[in-house]
UniProtKB/Swiss-Prot annotation:
Keywords: Cell membrane, Membrane, Methanogenesis, Methyltransferase, One-carbon metabolism, Transferase, Translocase, Transmembrane, Transmembrane helix. Its EC number is 7.2.1.4. The keyword Disulfide bond does not apply. Part of a complex that catalyzes the formation of methyl-coenzyme M and tetrahydromethanopterin from coenzyme M and methyl-tetrahydromethanopterin. This is an energy-conserving, sodium-ion translocating step. Pathway: One-carbon metabolism; methanogenesis from CO(2); methyl-coenzyme M from 5,10-methylene-5,6,7,8-tetrahydromethanopterin: step 2/2. It is found in: Cell membrane. It holds the Pfam family MtrC. GO terms for molecular function: tetrahydromethanopterin S-methyltransferase activity. The lineage of its organism: Archaea, Methanobacteriati, Methanobacteriota, Methanomada group, Methanobacteria. The gene is mtrC. This is Tetrahydromethanopterin S-methyltransferase subunit C.
Length: 267
């Protein structure tokens, strides 16, 4: 059971597949951001959603070793690490080809995630066996999701474009909050004895797509494809959220929309 401090419940989708989805989908979307001024930002945003789903699953695995109180903490910490990795990766253009920037950002974020996790185990004495692996994954997912949405806003993943359209405008602060909530909220909302991976990841898709819709609005005046990003994000959010609600109804013992639950003797 996921809140029994003994690790996550069974997984319908192997973590290796979700990692592949996050890394391949995330990087693919980022690199495709420049193929077309209108379609490119949509690809970048979809890549960010792939990374968010990967990160949400990693949160699910690592946070299942406690009562769930550390879900927001590791979420904010890991997205901070991811942003540091992204900025450092973008800055690598001074020594490496611009094409390498997203990969460098991902690698740096994951390395920093491992370092922070090791410090957490050695100094804070956190007894979570998969802390290093999951912190690295969440940090990497955060890096790709932030860079994906940044590319969607700026229309490109290059340092100059992101610096001008995302960092200088202050949108990077909003992306920090937005991506943290998108990654950590699914398990935070679904945790409990009956939590399961499928329902949690349906909510992760929902939070990812609503974040995509918001990222599209941030691109108003910055790229011509902002409206399509918001439209696709909003439509996909409706589908994902309806799927999550349906799954919740199917697995609930009963549903009550308002008022107090009846006492046992009144049933």
């Amino acid at each position: 059971m996921s809140v029994a401090a003994g690790g996550p419940a069974g997984a319908a989708i192997p973590e290796s597949r979700l990692m592949a989805l996050g890394i391949i989908g995330g990087l693919g979307g980022i690199y495709a951001s420049t193929v077309n001024p209108v379609i490119g930002p949509v690809f970048a945003s979809l890549g960010a959603v792939c990374a968010i789903i990967w990160g949400a699953d990693a949160i699910r695995r690592v946070a299942s070793y406690g009562l769930g109180t550390g879900v927001p903490s590791i979420g904010y910490m890991s997205v901070s690490i991811g942003i540091v990795g992204v900025v450092a990766g973008l800055a690598s253009v001074f020594t490496l080809p611009a094409l390498a920037a997203p990969v460098v950002g991902l690698i740096l974020a994951m390395i920093l995630g491992v370092v922070v996790a090791v410090l957490g185990k050695k100094i804070v004495k956190m007894k979570i066996p998969i802390l290093e692996k999951c912190t690295a994954e969440i940090s990497g997912a955060a890096a790709l999701s932030v860079l994906g949405f940044s590319a969607a806003i700026a229309g490109s993943y290059t340092m100059q474009a992101v610096l001008t359209s995302v960092i200088a405008t202050g949108f990077i602060g909003l992306l920090f909050i937005l991506n943290t909530m998108a990654i950590q909220h699914p398990f935070n909302a679904c945790l409990g004895p009956n939590e399961n991976q499928t329902r949690t990841l349906k909510l992760a898709a929902s939070t990812g797509f609503i974040s995509m819709a918001i990222a599209g609005l941030l691109g108003i005046g910055l790229n011509p494809g902002w409206w399509l990003v918001s439209l696709v994000g909003a439509l996909c959010w409706v589908v994902a959220f309806k799927s999550f609600v349906s799954a919740s109804f199917e697995e609930a013992a009963s549903v009550k929309w308002s008022g107090l639950w009846p006492k046992e003797e009144e049933q």
